[in-house]
C-alpha cells in the first residue's frame, strides 16, 4: 500500500525516548524539586538515526513522517528531527492548545479550522517542520468507546462527528478539502477496539 501511495508509514525514535526531556539541560518539577542534568542531543540523534536505519532495513525506504514518543514535541528537537529527513510529525491537540500562533496568541483548538490545519513549528535554531495535531475526541472514541458499540452505531457516530467538523469549517467560510482531520491512536489501545 505504501509503494502505491495509498498509505504513508511513519517512524518513531528508537527505544521510545521522550526527546524534549533529553534535549533539556534540566527542569524544575511542579513540587519545586530540581532535576539537574545536561542536554543530550547526541542521544536524541542516535535514537533518530537508529530508528530511521531500522525502518529502511525492514521496509526498503526512509520515511518522512514521525510519531514522536508520547507525542512529545519541543522547539529544541526540530533540528535533530529534520536532520534525519523527517518532514512532518504528529502530536496531540493538547500540545497545540499550549502553543502560540505567529501573533503570540494561544491556539483555540475548539476552532475546527485550527485543529484541522497542519502547522509549522520553528526550532530553536530556526529550522522548520510541519506538525499535524490529532483530534483527541474522535481518536479517543475509536480507541475507547467504539469497541463497546455495535458496528452500525460506531460508524454512525464517526460519520456524524466528521459531518459536524465539516459543517464547522463551512460555517467559518473554510473549504473542508483544504483541511486535514487527524485520527491517531497509540498502540496500547488496540485491546479496546475489538
What annotation goes with each model-predicted range?
Residues 69-194:
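Active-site-adjacent pocket scaffolds in enzyme catalytic domains
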Amino acid at each position: 500500500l505504501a509503494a502505491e501511495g495509498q498509505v504513508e508509514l511513519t517512524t518513531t525514535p528508537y527505544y521510545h525516548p521522550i526527546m524534549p526531556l533529553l534535549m533539556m539541560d534540566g527542569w524544575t518539577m511542579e513540587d519545586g524539586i530540581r532535576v539537574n542534568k545536561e542536554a543530550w542531543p547526541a542521544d536524541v540523534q542516535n535514537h533518530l538515526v537508529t530508528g530511521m536505519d531500522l525502518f529502511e532495513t525492514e521496509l526498503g525506504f526512509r520515511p518522512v513522517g514521525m510519531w514522536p514518543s508520547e507525542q512529545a514535541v519541543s522547539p529544541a528537537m526540530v533540528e535533530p528531527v529534520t536532520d534525519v529527513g523527517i518532514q512532518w510529525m504528529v502530536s496531540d491537540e493538547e500540545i497545540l492548545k499550549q502553543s502560540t500562533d505567529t501573533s503570540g496568541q494561544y491556539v483555540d483548538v475548539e476552532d475546527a479550522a485550527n485543529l484541522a490545519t497542519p502547522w509549522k513549528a520553528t526550532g530553536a535554531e530556526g529550522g522548520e517542520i510541519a506538525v499535524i495535531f490529532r483530534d483527541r475526541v474522535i481518536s479517543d472514541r475509536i480507541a475507547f468507546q467504539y469497541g463497546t458499540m455495535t458496528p452500525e452505531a460506531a460508524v454512525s457516530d464517526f460519520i456524524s462527528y466528521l459531518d459536524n467538523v465539516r459543517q464547522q469549517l463551512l460555517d467559518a467560510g473554510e473549504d473542508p478539502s483544504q483541511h486535514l482531520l487527524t485520527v491517531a491512536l497509540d498502540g496500547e489501545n488496540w485491546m479496546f477496539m475489538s
